[in-house]
């Protein structure tokens, strides 16, 4: 005997003799639904068309999708399924497909790069009568060029297209290159974050029992696990919510002032509104961010990967007070030197840089404020 609790189209069985499990599930259901919708909004996806499953990483999500598609084809026909993969896919895709091929569960075709991207025509030419899935990432793992996911999906004519789109999201290009049928993401909500597998509901048909173990009404994410995932998401630091909060504070401040100035002015130079009366000539624009990594790691990565000129890293309560950032955000601060006029595009660029670095920096914790480093 079991009662069914729905969560965004996914179901879980709850034994009636475990009321504490039901309470935990109800506590986590609404907040987790909010995170699901937040992710779909980030992707530009219609919430009514997609299922979302939280995973440990994009690697797990990719493996779920590939193995389920192969097994579904084997259940439908005796013909060995065929999988199309790109030449620059992440190892979680290529190794999974090759392992299934060694077990004689599938065959596969690797699409070579043309001008550092996957040509939709080459994908069309590779289609066979037994093709069950194509795996083409939003960006190539080696050279980071964009693939035309919608064009590739059009030539597949109903064959599901699965895409790893983490780089597209963290580079701010997902709206220009939206996923087609299913997608995976890595390290959402901070460097201790979660992975995501998103699928259109029409692609989900018959895949549910294979991905969730016992079908949509059994073996899917259990109720205590829903609440645990919710607690995990809200405890991540830094989180998307936190970064967006700081971003909004800067937008509000920069509507009144062209620059956020480096500290070093005497108190006589600072009027009641916390900013200098006269703008010093030639003073470049700066943006301040609270980040979850040590200053030394960020300095090298930003300078080498993005060619952004770094000013200096400080920890100054006076500066935070001037621009009215709440005390709970007083952590290691990063000043990134930009152009003479700090525009919204500059802010957007820095947002993308820091969110991307969030996904590639090893796990760690913030140093105490007194240990913040500075450099010229």
UniProtKB/Swiss-Prot annotation:
Disulfide bonds: none
Subcellular location: Virion
Pfam families documented for this protein: Aminotran_5
Induction comment from the UniProt entry of this chain: Expressed in the late phase of the viral replicative cycle.
Entry-linked Gene3D superfamilies: Aspartate Aminotransferase, domain 1 (3.90.1150.10), Type I PLP-dependent aspartate aminotransferase-like (Major domain) (3.40.640.10)
Binding-site residues, pyridoxal 5'-phosphate: 58-59, 184-186
Top-level taxon in the UniProt lineage: Viruses
Record keywords, A-Z: Virion
Main location: virion
Cofactor: pyridoxal 5'-phosphate
InterPro entries according to UniProt: Aminotrans_V_dom, PyrdxlP-dep_Trfase, PyrdxlP-dep_Trfase_major, PyrdxlP-dep_Trfase_small
Recorded GO CC terms: virion component
Family: Belongs to the class-V pyridoxal-phosphate-dependent aminotransferase family. NifS/IscS subfamily.
PANTHER family assigned to the protein according to its UniProt record, in alphabetical order: CYSTEINE DESULFURASE (PTHR11601:SF34), CYSTEINE DESULFURYLASE FAMILY MEMBER (PTHR11601)
Protein name: NifS-like protein
């Amino acid at each position: 005997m079991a009662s069914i609790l729905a969560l965004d189209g996914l179901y879980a069985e709850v034994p009636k003799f475990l009321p504490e499990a039901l309470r935990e599930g109800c506590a986590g259901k609404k907040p987790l639904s909010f995170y699901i919708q937040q992710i779909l909004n980030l992707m530009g996806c219609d919430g009514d068309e997609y299922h979302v499953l939280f995973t440990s990483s994009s690697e797990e999500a990719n493996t779920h999708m590939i193995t389920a598609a192969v097994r579904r084809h084997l259940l439908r026909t005796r013909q060995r399924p065929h999988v199309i993969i790109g030449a620059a896919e992440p190892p979680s895709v290529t190794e999974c497909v090759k392992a299934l091929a060694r077990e004689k569960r599938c065959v596969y075709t690797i699409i070579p790069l043309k001008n550092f991207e996957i040509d939709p025509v080459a994908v069309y030419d590779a289609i066979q009568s037994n093709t069950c899935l194509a795996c083409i990432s939003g960006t190539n793992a080696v050279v980071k060029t964009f693939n035309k996911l919608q064009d590739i999906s059009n030539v597949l004519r109903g064959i599901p297209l699965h895409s790893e789109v983490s780089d597209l999201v963290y580079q701010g290009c997902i709206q220009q290159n939206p996923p087609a049928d299913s997608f995976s993401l890595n390290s959402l909500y901070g460097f201790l974050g979660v992975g995501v597998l998103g699928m259109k509901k029409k692609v989900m048909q018959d895949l549910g029992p294979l991905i969730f173990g016992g079908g949509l009404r059994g073996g899917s994410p259990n109720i205590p696990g829903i609440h645990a995932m919710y607690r995990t998401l809200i405890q991540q630091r830094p989180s998307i919510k936190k970064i967006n909060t700081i971003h909004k504070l800067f937008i509000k401040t920069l509507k009144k002032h062209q620059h956020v100035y480096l500290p070093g002015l005497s108190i006589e130079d600072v009027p009641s509104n916390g900013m200098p009366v006269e703008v010093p000539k030639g003073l470049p624009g700066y943006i301040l961010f609270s980040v979850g990594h040590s200053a030394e790691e960020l300095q090298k990565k930003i300078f080498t990967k993005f060619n952004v000129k770094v000013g200096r890293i400080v920890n100054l309560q006076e500066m935070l007070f001037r621009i009215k950032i709440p005390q709970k955000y007083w952590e290691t601060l990063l000043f990134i030197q930009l152009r003479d006029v700090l525009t919204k595009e500059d802010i957007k660029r820095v947002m993308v840089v820091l969110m991307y670095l969030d996904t590639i920096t090893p796990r760690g914790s913030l140093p105490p404020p007194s240990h913040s480093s500075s450099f010229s």
